[in-house]
């Protein structure tokens, strides 16, 4: 399903694609906390509690050493192409990685392919979160697996149209951040209303329908 309103110059239909076809889903790992040689290194290592409302992840609270990294199942995630995605204990908190880093087991992060715009996918994360929460399972706490997340199907336009939409949301997020700083957390209501209405799960596959100019 494609949006009713689109940027001019993009006539091609949107296509349903599995998330696993546009991104590699990567889990994490934790070195032994009993070995001091594994900690206080220079490799960023994230836990779910560190993700909140920020768009970007710049620096983790804890870091591990190369020995710690080698000792566990953590994977180094590339900067600029990775969306951290919490998979339990609060499913669907996200941030775009600005520095190469790894995570603990509480993530199923999305490393987008070269033909996919990272900010476009980031603009979809509320819908991805909604899917993940519906598919999550577990007796102790709900969790979505990498395989389960990869199976989610969403509508995608061409890379150029993704970039146009992603750029629009990037500008909106930047303006929201500026207003938050200026007014001590109070963002411009117009931008907040547009962003929230666009990213609500009930507007699935229509991320540009309420905000994208046609000219």
What function would you assign to each model-found segment?
Residues 8-13, 109-116, 148-161, 166, ...:
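Proline-centric
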């Amino acid at each position: 399903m494609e949006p009713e309103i689109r940027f001019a110059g993009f006539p091609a239909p949107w296509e349903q694609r599995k998330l696993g076809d546009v991104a590699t889903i990567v889990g994490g790992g934790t070195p032994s906390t009993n070995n001091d040689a594994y900690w206080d290194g220079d490799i960023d290592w994230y836990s779910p509690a560190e993700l909140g409302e920020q768009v970007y992840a710049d620096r983790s609270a804890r870091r591990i050493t190369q020995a710690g990294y080698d000792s566990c199942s953590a994977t180094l995630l590339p900067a600029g192409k990775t969306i951290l995605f919490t998979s339990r204990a609060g499913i669907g908190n996200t941030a775009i990685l600005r520095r190469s880093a790894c995570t603990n087991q509480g993530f199923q992060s999305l490393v987008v392919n070269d033909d996919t715009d990272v900010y476009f996918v980031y603009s979809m994360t509320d819908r991805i979160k909604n899917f993940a929460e519906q598919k999550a399972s577990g007796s102790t706490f709900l969790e979505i697996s990498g395989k389960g997340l990869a199976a989610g199907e969403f509508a995608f336009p061409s890379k150029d149209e993704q970039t146009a939409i992603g750029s629009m949301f990037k500008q909106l997020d930047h303006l929201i951040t500026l207003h938050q700083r200026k007014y001590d957390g109070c963002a411009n209501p117009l931008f907040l209303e547009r962003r929230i209405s666009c990213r609500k799960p009930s507007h699935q596959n229509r991320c540009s329908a309420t905000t994208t100019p046609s000219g």
